[in-house]
Amino acid sequence: MQKVALVTGAGQGIGKAIALRLVKDGFAVAIADYNDATATAVAAEINQAGGRAVAIKVDVSRRDQVFAAVEQARKALGGFNVIVNNAGIAPSTPIESITEEIVDRVYNINVKGVIWGMQAAVEAFKKEGHGGKIVNACSQAGHVGNPELAVYSSSKFAVRGLTQTAARDLAPLGITVNGFCPGIVKTPMWAEIDRQCRKRRANRWATARLNLPNASPLAACRSLKTSPPACRSSPARIPTI
C-alpha cells in the first residue's frame, strides 16, 4: 500500500521541495498551503508527472483547519503515515520594533501550527491503527539567534523544544518525531527577509551563502528516517544543513 504524507507550506520553497522528494520516494502527498493557487499548481505538477497528490488549503494557525486538512488527506489518499510541519513565516523584527501583533502572528503560525499538526497527526495515526512519523521544520535560527529575526528565532527555539519533548511523549505510541534545521535557503521567504533587511547586516549572519531548496529534503526525508526501519526509535534528531 502506498504511504501518505502531508506537507504544510508545500506550495513553494522548501515545502515544495520536500513534497517532490517524498513523491520520488514513493509517497502520495497532500500539498497543504495557505495559498490555494500555489498548492494546486504543485499538486498538478506531481500528478502530471505520474505521482499522486491532492491540494489542500489550510491556515495552520487554526487548529480546526489543521485537523480537517489531515483528515481530508487521509480520506482522499487512503491512509496517513507522515506529516511534515514546514509552514512558517519570518518577518524582520529588530528588538525595538517588535509589536504584540508580530509576536502573535509568528507564534500562531510557527509554534501553534506545529502543535496542531502533531496533534492532528497523532489522531490520524490512531485511526489508521499504527504509528507514524512527524517531522518539524526547525532552523539554524533555533540554535543561534540571528540579527533582526528575534521573534522568528525564538519561535524556532520553541519548535526545537517541542520536537524533543514530543519525541519522548509519543515514542510509546510508535510515533517518531524529528526536526530538520535549514540555514539560509534561496526561497521566497528568504527573499522577503532580504528585502526587509536590505542586506545592511549580511556580514552578521552565521551563514553567508544561500543554500538551494533541494538540499532540505535530504534532511527532512533521509536524516529524519522516514523509511520503515525508523519505527524502532524516536531520536528527535535535529540536523543542520
Swiss-Prot record:
GO molecular function, one term: diacetyl reductase ((S)-acetoin forming) (NAD+) activity
InterPro entries assigned to the protein according to its UniProt record, in alphabetical order: 23BDH, NAD(P)-bd_dom_sf, Sc_DH/Rdtase_CS, SDR_fam
Reaction equations catalysed: (S)-acetoin + NAD(+) = diacetyl + NADH + H(+)
Gene3D superfamilies named among the record's database cross-references: NAD(P)-binding Rossmann-like Domain (3.40.50.720)
Disulphide bridges, residue numbers: none
Subunit structure: Homotetramer.
Protein name: Diacetyl reductase [(S)-acetoin forming]
Natural source organism: Raoultella terrigena
Gene from which this protein is expressed: budC
